[in-house]
Amino acid sequence: MCIRDRVDRAVTAALLSAFIALKGGDMVSLFSFDARPRVTSGAVRGSASFAMIQKRAAEIDYSSEETNFTLALTTLSAKLDRRSLVIVFTDFVDPISAELMLLTVGRLTERHLVLFMMMKDVELETLADMPPAAPEDVARAVTAGNLLRERQVVIGRLRLLGAHVIEASHQRLGPALVERYLQLKQEDLL
């Protein structure tokens, strides 16, 4: 799945959860970033606010700029004046970005409930599990397996920091988010 499709799936899942939250009377805010914050809606409440959230979500686009988690999550944290559920849609591309993200997340989880949404990387899983037919297939499988292990290490560290993590297929991203949101509400964690 190309990066643009991943962004579209994440935005669709965010809109689905925003709709459910607004219908339930909760406040919702949309915040998007890459190297710097790009889209922010401010906090809104009520079903009538969904059109504005949709309009702001339409401004979210793919960017080739490297994600700056430190700047974005620090900026977001400064805007939040009460304990909030912060949902972060992301994929980990390299260990350095992941390490910087982990440093910032640790500070964010001290005050907020943080939920990471990630799409399963079916392509990597397929490469890692594919029986080799040629020598280069072995190298691809080993590399894919290493990347998947690195991803699991980061997920484990996020959980140790107190963040919740959902890894779902692209088809289940929205429903999985709504299910977890409703579960967190039912458990009175919000």
Where are the regions a protein language model picked out?
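Exposed, interaction-prone extracellular/peripheral surfaces
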Residues: 4-190
